[in-house]
Amino acid sequence: MACARPLISVYSEKGESSGKNVTLPAVFKAPIRPDIVNFVHTNLRKNNRQPYAVSELAGHQTSAESWGTGRAVARIPRVRGGGTHRSGQGAFGNMCRGGRMFAPTKTWRRWHRRVNTTQKRYAICSALAASALPALVMSKGHRIEEVPELPLVVEDKVEGYKKTKEAVLLLKKLKARNDIKKVYASQRMRAGKGKMRNRRRIQRRGPCIIYNEDNGIIKAFRNIPGITLLNVSKLNILKLAPGGHVGRFCIWTESAFRKLDELYGTWRKAASLKSNYNLPMHKMINTDLSRILKSPEIQRALRAPRKKIHRRVLKKNPLKNLRIMLKLNPYAKTMRRNTILRQARNHKLRVDKAAAAAAALQAKSDEKAAVAGKKPVVGKKGKKAAVGVKKQKKPLVGKKAAATKKPAPEKKPAEKKPTTEEKKPAA
């Protein structure tokens, strides 16, 4: 595929070059601003919306009244009466089943948007300029690998087509049939509730046919899936950039292609079919930044590059890195060695002291055993226990003590001793 500049070849209905050339209109060199295209597309698309709203009575067609406080239930209004499940249920609130929605929609919403005329023209210029770049067109998914040239211009004889078979044959000759096959392959069922609203099927977009006069071309192309037809005097950004994305594959008739300079003008001459309008200017005449920066004018103004290399030294922690510590303090090695030796010496002293104490304790216990005349018995842990000495039981405490305690014997009543008066016999 060729992207010819500044002349464009005109192709015949047989798909071959007719030998005629057309000068590339200046609008194809306009700045491409995807942000403006997206903004204009978003706002213009809102103008197709139809007002909708819920009923003003929805959710309020019941006799409900709050029960007030003191019943340990929420204070939401409740349906009156009895004998049915509905009685006592909450009503009116947006949190209730059968209640109204929050902030019910109204028909007096601001549905439509006004867009500046200059902005709309800028967006159309950007969309047309993007349609001439094969990379952008292919990024949109159009199958233009075999198309001979972009922009693709055909003779005006095509505007007189009235049969669909003629249009299909033309697309085959121009190698644009692959884009139509892509549309057929993409036909599928819509997701969501649009299926119930006469929008069951969706499909991809195909080529956009732009003509100057309708001599039957609309009837010839309108039944081919994915095809969009536009009059060059009534270009629509919603069709040139579907979804707000630039890069639609466009097929032009020769007269429509020649008319673009009159519609949008050149930078040297204003548009003749529009009142005081000219193409938007580029912010940069030359967008090749590398070429600009390497130009002798800029290089002359720049200073020579500094080639001195400053190596960044990694600072290491001397408390964790012995090599760095020895660089800072060579005596640190001697200090560390002395510390290790002192720790080893202290450890040996502790071990010897513990061994001497154990030996003294052993000798003392042997002495006591010899005095008692009993042979000492060595226990499991190396301690000597006296033979014949019973181990005292620990006193029981709590419930165990109460369970094992023997009941005290019942005390007999003490017999009274006779007093001196009782001992004396009666006279």
Swiss-Prot record:
Gene Ontology CC: cytoplasm; ribonucleoprotein complex; ribosome
Cross-link (Glycyl lysine isopeptide (Lys-Gly) (interchain with G-Cter in SUMO1)) at residue(s): K364
Positions where Citrulline occurs in the chain: R300
Residues modified to Omega-N-methylarginine: R97
Signal peptide stretch: none
Matches recorded under SUPFAM superfamilies: Ribosomal protein L4 (SSF52166)
Compartments reported by the entry: Cytoplasm
Transmembrane segments: none
Location in chain, cross-link Glycyl lysine isopeptide (Lys-Gly) (interchain with G-Cter in SUMO2): K239, K327
A Pfam short name: Ribos_L4_asso_C
Post-translational modification as stated in the protein's UniProt record: Citrullinated by PADI4.
A biological process from GO: translation
N-acetylalanine, modified sites: A2
Main location: cytoplasm
Assigned keywords, A-Z: Acetylation, Citrullination, Cytoplasm, Isopeptide bond, Methylation, Phosphoprotein, Ribonucleoprotein, Ribosomal protein, Ubl conjugation
Phosphothreonine modification, residue list: T266
Assembly notes: Component of the large ribosomal subunit. May bind IPO9 with low affinity. Interacts with RBM3.
PANTHER family attached to this UniProt entry: 60S RIBOSOMAL PROTEIN L4
Family that this chain belongs to: Belongs to the universal ribosomal protein uL4 family.
Protein name: Large ribosomal subunit protein uL4
Source taxonomy: Eukaryota, Metazoa, Chordata, Craniata, Vertebrata
